[in-house]
Regions:
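Hydrophobic transmembrane alpha-helices
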Residues: 2-67, 149-181, 187-276
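Intramembrane catalytic core of multi-pass membrane enzymes that act on lipidic substrates
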Residues: 60, 65-153, 163-167
Length: 276
């Protein structure tokens, strides 16, 4: 079973079957799925090892060379005085990219273990693991290729790295804080059946999606400069605005009724405050 499947007949999800199939989360279903969540945790936990293998040892770069692309030399390793960091043997720029992979894995494992109550089937966990590995590797290989790397656009720290890192930190912290705020609200029995409209959610109705879009764009920008950052950011903005938000809005309209309509009036922005 993959995310979105197995929702048919779920009395807690009043949406149409077409909307349920498009959703990656079984809304209103809190069936325990320890195997799936364990698989999610493990796959996300080991994914940074893949990024390290690419950054430190050039895993897969032979394919780039085979099609005529050149890759960057390793660069001088970082010296911080911290053995755990220095032992990685990565240049400062590569260390930042690895840190982004680690940060994303940690954030998502916090989500699956402490913040999400919905089911996570094993197949869904595998899909999420592969998805993240592909997008993170895209940024890493874009960095390594001299044709696309943000690293060759000036001296360290390059503007694309500074801007991308800022977007990454703001985005991932926004997503995490928003989800923690909502979780704390939902854990209070007095709030059962209520929509959470406070905290960061008062700035945009799907602020967690906005945060995700920002950090994904920032990660891509840090690796593949402005073009890749813009493409990745546009992709997620499109997916959320055309798929995820409409089907979640349908769920919230039918579950919360007048509460949700009032929220929409008070908070007109859906994804990113003052933009969309």
């Amino acid at each position: 079973m993959s995310p979105g499947q197995g929702q048919k007949g779920n009395p807690n999800d009043p949406r149409s079957e077409a909307s349920k199939k498009k959703d990656l989360i079984a809304r209103g279903d809190y069936t325990p799925t320890p195997a799936g969540k364990a698989a999610f945790f493990i796959l996300r936990g080991i994914e940074p090892v893949l990024q390290y293998s690419i950054l430190a040892h050039g895993l897969g770069t032979s394919v780039l060379h085979r099609v005529g692309l050149r890759t960057l030399p390793p660069g001088l390793p970082t010296h911080t005085g911290v053995p755990l960091i220095d032992g990685l043997g990565l240049s400062p720029y590569r260390l930042v990219l690895l840190g982004m992979a680690v940060g994303a894995a940690v954030k998502q494992n916090i989500w699956v273990t402490a913040l999400s109550g919905e089911p996570m089937p094993v197949t869904g966990a595998i899909a999420v693991g592969v998805f993240n590995a592909v997008f993170n590797s895209l940024s890493t290989y874009a960095f390594l290729s001299t044709a696309t790397s943000a690293s060759i656009k000036g001296d360290f720290p390059q503007p694309a790295l500074l801007i991308g890192s800022s977007l990454y930190v703001v985005g991932i912290m926004t997503e995490l804080i928003a989800e923690v705020q909502r979780k704390r609200f939902k854990m209070n029995p007095d709030n059962k059946g209520k929509a959470y409209t406070g905290g960061l959610w008062s700035f945009a109705r799907h602020i967690n999606y906005g945060g995700y879009t920002l950090w994904r764009a920032g990660y891509a920008m840090a690796g593949g400069s402005y073009t890749l950052g813009a493409l990745v950011g546009a992709f997620f903005a499109w997916d959320f605005s055309q798929r995820a938000i409409p089907i979640l809005n349908e769920y919230c309209e039918k579950r919360y009724g007048a509460q949700w309509e009032e929220f929409k009036q008070k908070t007109p922005y859906q994804l990113i405050p003052y933009i969309y």
